[in-house]
């Protein structure tokens, strides 16, 4: 299962990006996709602390309280390995996104072709990581 967390403080952006993500899920019948939507970094962070992480994080950068960059850094400090995709109106923070080991940095507005391609790349990367891991059974 591919779990995707969308976090954006603007309702209109949550709605439009959320619709794109739902279209992505519908266009990928070979993948089970579960989307969770958050209006603040703190809400997402609280959910991750209580219930665990997500496969992919689609994060706005400029948000009140805790920026998307700072949220990404905190997720990494908590050892969450999900792919972080920043989606924002400003290229100003692109270099800062390296601190969170971002998978990609996209500019708003983003079209479905670009977003779907990046999501496919992230999902493929996660599949490769899972396949490369080794389980050792002990007594």
Protein language model features and the residues they cover:
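Conserved SAM-binding loop
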Residues: 6, 37, 86-87
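Conserved Asp/Asn-Gly motif in the active-site loop of CheY-like receiver
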Residues: 35-43
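A generic structural motif
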Residues: 25-35, 81-82
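Conserved acidic segment of CheY-like receiver
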Residues: 2-22, 57
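C-terminal output/effector regions of signal-responsive regulators
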Residues: 135-139
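CheY-like receiver
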Residues: 46-129
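Short, well-ordered amphipathic alpha-helices
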Residues: 15-25, 44-45, 72, 120
């Amino acid at each position: 299962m591919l779990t995707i967390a969308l976090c954006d403080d603007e309702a209109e952006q949550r709605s439009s990006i959320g619709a794109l993500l739902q279209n992505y899920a519908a266009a990928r019948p070979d993948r089970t996709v579960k989307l969770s939507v958050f209006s603040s970094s703190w809400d997402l962070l609280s959910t991750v602390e209580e219930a665990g992480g997500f496969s992919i994080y689609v994060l706005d950068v400029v948000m009140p309280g805790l920026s998307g960059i700072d949220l990404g850094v905190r997720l990494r400090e908590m050892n969450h390995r999900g792919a972080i995709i920043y989606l924002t109106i400003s290229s100003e923070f692109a270099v800062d996104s390296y601190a969170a080991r971002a998978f990609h940095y996209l500019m708003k507005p983003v079209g479905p072709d670009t977003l779907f391609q990046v999501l496919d790349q992230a999902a493929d990367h996660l599949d490769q990581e899972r396949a490369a891991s080794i389980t050792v059974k002990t007594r």
